[in-house]
Amino acid sequence: MKNNILFILAAILTISCSSGIDTDKLKTEKFTVYGNCGMCKKTIEGSLDGVKGIEEANWNPKNDKMTVSFDSELITLEQIKQKIADVGYDSDSHRAKDKVYDNLHGCCKYERPKK
């Protein structure tokens, strides 16, 4: 019984420590994503949760800078920016659809850059 418990704990630890991404292939990029608040942060970062190839995503509401570490063999920077735009947030190169932006919570409606 004791051996079974130790085996299960070792298996859980091994699985939880492995992201499946080859860290030697990770690329880190910084770019602008417009937003306002903590709710924006949750939505922006959440748009990349569980996306294959994304290792880490962090948006800073103080300077609108997004930092993403990803495996460029699994996902491109353009795809990442599109996923963020799909939830209503403009970046330096991708614009969210007006209808999606209009559905953001009031505190999340940032001043949109000119088209």
Predicted regions located by residue number:
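Conserved short beta-strand edge segments in small beta-sheet-based binding/regulatory domains
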Residues: 88-100
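Short amphipathic alpha-helices in soluble, non-transmembrane regions
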Residues: 44-47, 79-88
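C-terminal motif of bacterial Sec signal peptides marking the signal peptidase cleavage site
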Residues: 13-16
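Bacterial signal peptide processing site
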Residues: 18-20
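Post-signal-peptide N-terminal segment of Sec-exported extracytoplasmic proteins
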Residues: 35-67, 73-74
